[in-house]
Design a protein with these regions (language model features):
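N-terminal loops that bind phosphate or other acidic moieties
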Residues: 1-219
Length: 219
């Protein structure tokens, strides 16, 4: 791969931009089965994160990820703050002290983050939550790397798996969170948390691809 401190910083900034761009869409999705605030809350949190980023190409990747997590916990309301905060905090713990992440490091960090979200939210595949996008993304990332894929290929497959998991939430009946109160009426709606999780994985792929392209042009 590898993912440098600067690239991780760029990924966080790209995710913030994607959340801002899709704020109304995420809130629209949430209005059907939730509190109609997912896009608003996530955008507020990610804008706060941008204010905490120091930039630079070098540093502790784990510390950077933990900063993101702590900021989200303190600024994002509803369930999203604790869940996304846990994701980044656990990723940060996995990546602690590392100036860059190999493909295997990235997969381990993401897996640790997703496991933390599952523990926190007590959600499983099929519950119509962000887990439906994140778990397939981790599995695709690991299997791709184990099969000899490049970092870019692995991230592409991971993002594709997250997208497929996101769309697979549409027919599901929610079993967790506010949406579960609707019972059968929660079906035929895409889960907003799974959607923002897809944006997280999509921007990871795009950030690495853009950086690799710039490096190739500079050689």
């Amino acid at each position: 791969m590898p993912f440098s401190h600067g690239q991780v910083d760029g990924w966080i900034r790209a995710f913030a931009a994607a959340i801002a761009e899709n704020k109304e869409y995420l809130t629209e999705l949430d209005s059907a089965i939730g509190d109609a605030d997912h896009g608003i809350n996530m955008n507020r949190g990610m804008q706060a994160v941008l204010g905490k980023l120091e930039g630079g190409s070098q540093g502790d990747v784990g510390a950077l990820l933990k900063t993101v997590g702590m900021t989200l916990v303190s600024t994002v309301g509803g369930a999203s703050g604790p869940l996304y905060g846990t994701l980044f905090l656990q990723m940060g713990s996995s990546a602690a002290g590392k100036p860059e992440l190999s493909g295997e490091d990235w997969a381990a960090a993401l897996a640790a983050g997703v496991a933390g979200v599952q523990r926190r939210g007590k959600a499983e595949l099929g519950d119509k939550t962000m887990i439906d996008a994140l778990v397939p993304a981790v599995e695709a990332l690991r299997s791709s790397l184990a099969g000899g894929a490049t970092g870019g290929e692995a991230l592409h497959r991971s993002a594709e798996a997250a997208r497929d998991g996101m769309t697979a939430t549409i027919p599901l009946v929610a079993r967790k969170g506010r949406a579960s109160y609707l019972g059968e009426r929660s079906a035929n709606h895409q889960d907003p948390g799974a959607t923002s999780s897809w944006l997280l994985l999509r921007t990871a792929e795009e950030t690495l691809a853009a950086t690799q392209s710039q490096q190739q042009q500079g050689t």
